[in-house]
Regions:
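Extreme N-terminal leader/targeting segments of oxidoreductases
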Residues: 2-64
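Conserved flavin/dinucleotide-binding core of flavoenzymes
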Residues: 32-54, 353-355, 360, 366-510
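Mid-domain catalytic core of redox enzymes
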Residues: 60, 272-384, 418
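N-terminal Rossmann-like FAD-binding beta1-loop-alpha1 element of flavoenzymes
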Residues: 66-88
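Glycine-rich FAD pyrophosphate-binding loop
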Residues: 83-103
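Glycine-rich active-site loop/strand segments that organize a redox cofactor
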Residues: 98-120, 177-184
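Mobile amphipathic helical/loop "lid" adjacent to a hydrophobic cofactor/ligand pocket
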Residues: 124, 128-129, 133-225
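Active-site/ligand-binding neighborhood in enzyme catalytic cores
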Residues: 183-278, 285-287
Length: 510
C-alpha cells in the first residue's frame, strides 16, 4: 500500500488485548503523513491483578441476591434468566457483548467476532424468546485455492480442487477415515488425541486447509486441536443441510437484543466500565470489589456467577482450591483480530463464508449475506469480514497500532491476490477489532479433563462462560452455561437439598 493511500484510508483499531482489560484505540488517516493518534486506557490495574497485587477493599456499600461478573452473551443471558431476583451485572468494557459485539457503518451492521449460530440451539431459542429471528445462511462454504474458486469444499468440491489427482484422492480418503470415527462413541479417546495424528500420511494440502479452518473456528491448528472436535466438525461441514443461522452483526445481534431487553427495566443494575479486582467468598456472602469511574467499590451478594474466562476467574477468587486453579490456568487462549473492510461498490457476494488457506487471514464472510434473499433488499456497501487469528506468541503484536495496521495491510494485499477481479478492490474504510484472549483452545484433553476440573462451583460462586461447556467456544455454549448457572443459583436460593444442587453442579461442568 502506498504512503498516500495509507494516509487517505480511514483505519480504526479497537478491542481488548490485555488480560481482562479494556482498550479502545483509534487510528484515523490524515491528509499528510503524521504519527498515528492513539487514544485508550492504561493497563495498570489489570496487570496488577494479573501479578497478584492486593487492593485495599472499601466497606460493602450495597448487597444483592446475585452479582454476575462479565457482560458477554453468557453474563447477559444469566442476567436475563435471573431477572426475577435482585441482581447486579458488571462488565469491564464500555459496551455489552464480549466476543459477540457488532458495529455499524452507515446503518449496516457487521460482526467483530462471533459470527453465526445454528438452528435449535439454546442460543437460537433464547433469541426467538426475546423477539429476534435469525435468518438461514444456506450457503455451503467454498474455498479459494491457487486462484480457483471451489464450491462446497468438502463435498462435491473435492473433485474440483486445483491439485493433482493423487492429492484430491488423499482428501477423499481422509474424509472417509474421519467420518468413520464415530466421535459420540469415542469421546474420551478422540478428545485426548490431536488432529495432527490423523493427518499423518495424507497430502500436506489437507493440513494446510485445517490449519486455516481450526484457528478461525476455535483458535487452534491441527497440533493443538482435539481430534474429537475435528471429527465432529467434519460431520457438520459434510452434512446435506446447512443449519447455520445469523443476522448482520453475527451473534452481536443477540447480545445487543439481550441488552436492549434488560436495560429499560434494569439499567441501574447493569454497570459497564467496571474492572473487577477481587471476588472474595465469605461464609454467608461473596464480596466483589471493582473499579468504576476511578473509584474502588465493594458490594456483596449471596451468590456470584462468574461469566468470565477461567484465566480471569482464577486470578480474582482466592477461595478456588489449588487443583481447580491449576486446571483453570491450564486453558490456552488465542489472540484474534477481526478485520472488516468496507467497499462502496460490489466486490464479492458469491458465498457467505469463503476459506483461503495459506494467507494472512483464514476466511472472510459477507456481512449482509442473509439479507440478500429478503424481498426488496439492496446492498448499500459491500462489507467483508476477515478472520485473522494469530498464534499465542504473536499476542503482543496487538498492543501496537503500527503492528495492527501492518496486519490489516497484509490482509488486504493477500485478498487482492486471491483472484484477478479482486486486484483493484480498495476499501473506503478498514476497521480492526482485536482481542487478546477471546477463545479457549480445544487442545487434547481440555473437554474431558480440564473443563470438568475447572468448572466445579464453590459454595457461593458458580462459573459460566463458553469455557465451562466446550468442546469449543460457541455462542450456544455461552447460553447453556448461563442457564445451568442460573438454575444452580435458583436452587441455592430456594434452599434445595445438597444432592439436587450437586446434580445441577454436574450439569454446569458437563
Amino acid at each position: 500500500m502506498t504512503e498516500s493511500r495509507r494516509n487517505f484510508l480511514k483505519f480504526i483499531v479497537a478491542g481488548s488485548v490485555a488480560a481482562g482489560c479494556p482498550i479502545n484505540l483509534s487510528l484515523l488517516g490524515a491528509e499528510s503523513p503524521t504519527r498515528p493518534r492513539v487514544d485508550g486506557e492504561h493497563f495498570e490495574i489489570c496487570h496488577q491483578v494479573r501479578d497478584g497485587k492486593s487492593f485495599a477493599k472499601p466497606p460493602v456499600s450495597k448487597r444483592y441476591d446475585v452479582v454476575i461478573v462479565g457482560g458477554g452473551v453468557s453474563g447477559l443471558s444469566a442476567a436475563y434468566f435471573l431477572r426475577g431476583h435482585d441482581f447486579l451485572l458488571l462488565e469491564k468494557e464500555p459496551q455489552w457483548g464480549g466476543n459477540a459485539y457488532l458495529e455499524e457503518y452507515e446503518g449496516q451492521a457487521f460482526a467483530t467476532g462471533s459470527a453465526f449460530d445454528e438452528k435449535g440451539t439454546a442460543s437460537e431459542q433464547l433469541a426467538r424468546e426475546i423477539g429476534l429471528t435469525l435468518l438461514p445462511i444456506n450457503s455451503k462454504d467454498p474455498s479459494i485455492i491457487a486462484g480457483k474458486w471451489v464450491p462446497d469444499t468438502w463435498r462435491s468440491g473435492l473433485d474440483q480442487l486445483p491439485y493433482p489427482a493423487s492429492v484430491r484422492e488423499s482428501f477423499k480418503k481422509f474424509r472417509a477415515e474421519i467420518l468413520a470415527l464415530d466421535p459420540d462413541k469415542n469421546v474420551q479417546q478422540l478428545d485426548n488425541e490431536p488432529l495432527s495424528k490423523y493427518l499423518k500420511g495424507y497430502a500436506p494440502e489437507i493440513k494446510q486447509w485445517w490449519d486455516a479452518y481450526g484457528p478461525s473456528n476455535w483458535g487452534a491448528n491441527s497440533e493443538d486441536t482435539s481430534a474429537y472436535v475435528a471429527a465432529g466438525e467434519l460431520q457438520y461441514i459434510t452434512a446435506e443441510e446447512d443449519t447455520r443461522v445469523t443476522l448482520p452483526g453475527g451473534n452481536g445481534a443477540l447480545s445487543r437484543q439481550l441488552a436492549s431487553t434488560l436495560q429499560p427495566k434494569y439499567a441501574e443494575r447493569m454497570i459497564s466500565d467496571a474492572t473487577i479486582v477481587a471476588v472474595d467468598q465469605q461464609q454467608t456472602e461473596v464480596r466483589v470489589t471493582y473499579v468504576h469511574e476511578g473509584e474502588l467499590r465493594t458490594i456483596a451478594a449471596k451468590y456470584v456467577v462468574m461469566a468470565t474466562p477461567k484465566f480471569i476467574a482464577s486470578r480474582l477468587i482466592p477461595a478456588i482450591p489449588d487443583a481447580q486453579r491449576e486446571a483453570m490456568l491450564s486453558y490456552r487462549y488465542c489472540p484474534y483480530p477481526v478485520i472488516n473492510m468496507i467497499f462502496d461498490k460490489p466486490v464479492y457476494n458469491r458465498a457467505y463464508d469463503t476459506w483461503c488457506p495459506g494467507n494472512t487471514f483464514t476466511d472472510f464472510i459477507v456481512a449482509d449475506w442473509v439479507l440478500h434473499a429478503q424481498p426488496g433488499y439492496v446492498q448499500k456497501n459491500n462489507i467483508l469480514t476477515f478472520y485473522t487469528p494469530l498464534s499465542e506468541v504473536q499476542r503482543r503484536e496487538l498492543l501496537r497500532v503500527e503492528s495492527c495496521q501492518k496486519i490489516a495491510e497484509n490482509v488486504l494485499g493477500d485478498f487482492q491476490k486471491l483472484q484477478p477481479e479482486f486486484a483493484s478492490a480498495q476499501p473506503v474504510e478498514i476497521r480492526m477489532y482485536r482481542r487478546g484472549h477471546p477463545m479457549f483452545l480445544p487442545t487434547p484433553g481440555t473437554f474431558t479433563e480440564v473443563i470438568p476440573a475447572a468448572t466445579q462451583p464453590l459454595e457461593r460462586i458458580v462459573f459460566a462462560n463458553t469455557d465451562s461447556v466446550g468442546p469449543e467456544s460457541e455462542v450456544s455454549g455461552a447460553v447453556e452455561a448461563a442457564h445451568h448457572a442460573a438454575e444452580w443459583v435458583e436452587k441455592k436460593m430456594a434452599g434445595t437439598t445438597t444432592a439436587s444442587v450437586a446434580r445441577t453442579a454436574s450439569a454446569v461442568s458437563a
